[in-house]
From Swiss-Prot:
This is Histone H4. Residues 1-14 have a biased composition (Gly residues). Residues 1-20 are annotated as: Disordered. Signal peptide: none annotated. The modification N-acetylserine is found at S2. Keywords: Acetylation, Chromosome, DNA-binding, Methylation, Nucleosome core, Nucleus.
Amino acid sequence: MSGRGKGGKGLGKGGAKRHRKILRDNIQGITKPAIRRLARRGGVKRISGLIYEETRGVLKVFLENVIRDAVTYTEHAKRKTVTAMDVVYALKRQGRTLYGFGG
């Protein structure tokens, strides 16, 4: 027994035995003032109270779609790290071309 715990394979390359923090209600991290600032940038003067939850929902769906596509590109390339280019290609696939991040 080398006293390295369950995943002890020596240096590096220690399987997928890390503890993952359970993610709950992270969408609430998109705060009311943050949504208000985005709306102001878009030229909105007055905002209904119901907008905030609706915006969080729409943003969540949008990000899920982009991230799913970006991860698909990453997996296809047999990588474990999602690159900026994966996200650029994912956005392009959805018809939202983004300039300024290479490619």
